[in-house]
UniProtKB/Swiss-Prot annotation:
Name of this chain's protein: Carbonic anhydrase 13
Entry annotated with the keyword Ribosomal protein: no
Record key words, sorted: Lyase, Metal-binding, Zinc
Any one GO molecular function term: zinc ion binding
Protein species of origin: Homo sapiens (Human)
Domain named Alpha-carbonic anhydrase: residues: 4-261
Signal peptide: none
Amino acid sequence: MSRLSWGYREHNGPIHWKEFFPIADGDQQSPIEIKTKEVKYDSSLRPLSIKYDPSSAKIISNSGHSFNVDFDDTENKSVLRGGPLTGSYRLRQVHLHWGSADDHGSEHIVDGVSYAAELHVVHWNSDKYPSFVEAAHEPDGLAVLGVFLQIGEPNSQLQKITDTLDSIKEKGKQTRFTNFDLLSLLPPSWDYWTYPGSLTVPPLLESVTWIVLKQPINISSQQLAKFRSLLCTAEGEAAAFLVSNHRPPQPLKGRKVRASFH
């Protein structure tokens, strides 16, 4: 494995990441297991304020690690405010983590229970920093909204994504993707847990305020299977499916998880 060739297979998966990214063993790594008995309700946490403009979605691509929807983040068109955050955090990207079967796949775990998948909505602190790249190195630089997915009815909001997957099957492929109503993908309740953590993929930077929504959204088993049909290999390489792309929970190391709800 080299710095660039990390992944989720046996030879380059999460247990190997620390060889090139020593922060993998750091004090504020993500994901974690949320143990609800140890979580403290914090009355100072505000409700989330979310404004997402569907026209700010630009491209969907296959990174070899997930699909990514990238958003135009040149101005505050789509922003996350409130909650545990100070100032405005601009929407940058959305991606998904899943497992090889429907009974696991989320990165965060709640009281020992895994969900089928977990959507990550990545934002950066545009009030304090000039770009995502610079914000990613600062302790208050990023905010990631985590949304759990459970198996249930087909999700019509996810269909727009699953319909494009055939055109980005191989790593490195991308296609235009706009008018994506991300707000309608979120669950009705925005109750959340929050804690200081990291990116869950290399470079694993400890710059993330995590906001994990308690209420899951639905995905059908058939929709989820579409994601496993993506390849983690590029055109011309020996094809390998991206059957699983989640990092296991990391030690809490004294961090406190707070809840916005009783």
